Design a protein with these regions (language model features):
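Glycine-centered tight-turn motifs at strand-turn-strand junctions
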Residues: 370-402
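A short beta-strand motif characteristic of beta-propeller blades
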Residues: 41-49, 99-109, 145-154, 189-194, ...
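A short helix->beta-strand "capping" segment at the edge of beta-propeller domains
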Residues: 18-55
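Blade-level signature of beta-propeller repeat domains, shared across WD40, Kelch, NHL, RCC1
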Residues: 297-338
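Short loop/turn segments that connect beta-strands within beta-propeller blades
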Residues: 94-97, 140-144, 185-189, 234-238, ...
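Beta-rich, blade/repeat-based domains predominating
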Residues: 48-77, 108-122, 154-166, 197-215, ...
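Conserved beta-propeller blade signature
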Residues: 67, 73-75, 79-82, 125-127, ...
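Short loop/turn segments immediately following the C-termini of beta-strands
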Residues: 85-86, 131-132, 176, 225, ...
Length: 431
């Protein structure tokens, strides 16, 4: 995997991979120990022609023009696009080793005025919310460079903020000023308006035609209320679920942009508290990642986020940089209890909360010897998981009283599978 898949793979700060987390830095051999972009490295790649200046939306895709169908080793080589808002330009990788710029200030061809959201598909189509010009700009990547295709929406849009393609020829656009989601064809024909929102921001759409999605639901995820509320809608605009970001364990949350992974988990950048919030496809809260700062696993005013669904490669834009992660997993709750029933029926209940699907080996040990292997390589679902041990050893005999250790070794099922694992344990006193 070559590091310049990211829009900023201007990346300069190097570390070896650490412990397993919900988002994890890739191992050294995949990134040469590089996972974070800086302005000095951007200058090295492009010359002193631009700086990170109000980064906004990010998009990633695997270009068909780059694909060699006879070589699956290149399937993780992505094209990434990032909006450099105050410079009215797009930063993108022209190859796996070089960056390019597209756009300048203005209202004509190849020009932008305070662009915000961006979305792209494998065929090479790229759409930008040219917010200040009240339009959508359509450009095309032929595998070598970006070229102008046209613009549309000027007669309808007031403040286009973010957009999301379906890969079926339709584009969903949030209009913050109108409180709507506008649906267009790739050719710019207006299909319909979905109303009832208040200052919508980020948007992400699932669709059966989207490359590498597990479910392929016809579903829209949108940040409403200036980023305070995350909603799930069907394609008719009917609300299916919603969650107030201020009800999760954070204060003053303000969601910026959204990305979906392979399983339709919803990842939301929150610039107010320097975190990324993760929800499942039904908008049940899973976890929050990060804190304010510029060290590892910290964020500085996170804005855009993009995930390549097939492998979980994740890019997060910040005030003056970007970070590159893989989707991992974590166990954030590990509790045990003994049921208060008759002795012959007593069991130990193991209660876990898992932030992404995981493979787990679960063993009961006495003085470091395994007395019971509950699971050897069990796939566990995301969220709350309950496992019971009947207090018997591998031979089916009731274990004698004493202190036992329950040990769990788990690893991700997604992009980082085979590269990371984590072992946790707890003691329990069996009467």
């Amino acid at each position: 995997m070559k590091i310049t898949i990211a829009i900023l793979l201007s990346i300069v700060i190097g570390v070896t991979a650490g412990d397993l987390r919900t988002l994890v830095y890739p191992p050294f051999k995949h990134t040469w120990g590089i996972h974070k972009g800086t302005e000095s490295k951007l200058d090295m790649l492009l010359g002193d022609v631009t700086d990170f200046d109000n980064p906004q939306g990010i998009a990633v895709t695997r270009l068909l023009a780059w694909d060699d169908p006879d070589d699956n080793k290149d399937d993780d080589e992505l094209t990434a696009y990032g909006i450099n808002g105050n410079r009215d330009q797009i930063i993108y990788n022209t190859s796996m080793y070089s960056l390019g710029l597209y756009g300048k200030s203005g209202s004509g061809k190849g020009q932008f005025n305070s662009p915000r959201g961006i979305s792209a598909d494998p065929a090479g189509d790229v759409f930008i919310c040219d917010t200040g010009n009240k339009r959508i700009v359509h450009i095309f990547n032929d595998g070598d460079e970006l070229g102008w295709k046209g613009s549309f929406g000027q007669d309808l849009l007031v403040e286009p903020h973010d957009c999301s393609v379906t890969e079926a020829g339709t584009l969903y656009v949030t209009d913050r000023a109108r409180g709507t989601i506008e649906v267009f064809t790739y050719n710019g024909e207006h299909v319909r308006t979905l109303g009832g929102l208040v200052n919508p921001r980020g948007i992400a759409v699932d669709h059966p035609k989207i490359t590498k999605t597990r479910y392929g639901y016809e579903r829209i995820f949108v940040l409403d209320g200036d980023g305070a509320i995350l909603r799930s809608l069907d394609y008719s605009g009917k609300m299916l679920a919603s969650v107030n970001l201020r009800d999760i364990p954070e204060d003053n949350s303000a969601g910026k942009y959204i990305a979906l992974d392979f399983y339709d988990n919803v990842w939301v950048t929150d610039s107010a508290v320097c975190k990324i919030h993760k929800f499942d496809k039904d908008l049940k809260y899973i976890t929050s990642i990060g804190e304010c700062g510029d060290d590892d696993y910290q964020f500085d005013y996170p804005s855009g986020i993009a995930i390549w669904r097939r492998f979980g490669q994740t890019i997060v834009g910040e005030r003056h940089s970007a970070q590159y992660f893989w989707v991992g997993t974590d166990i954030t709750r590990f509790e045990t209890s003994i049921t208060k029933e008759e002795e012959s029926d007593s069991t130990v209940e193991i209660s876990l909360f898992i932030t992404d699907r995981a493979y787990a080996k679960i063993e009961v040990k006495k003085d470091d010897d395994v007395v019971r292997q509950i699971y050897e390589h069990k796939r566990l679902r995301q969220g709350s998981v309950s496992i019971r041990w009947d207090m018997k050893d591998d031979a089916g005999n009731r274990v004698p009283p004493g202190k036992y250790k329950i040990e769990i070794t788990y690893e991700p099922t997604y992009s980082s599978y085979g590269f990371f694992d984590e072992t946790i344990d707890t003691e329990i006193d069996i009467p």
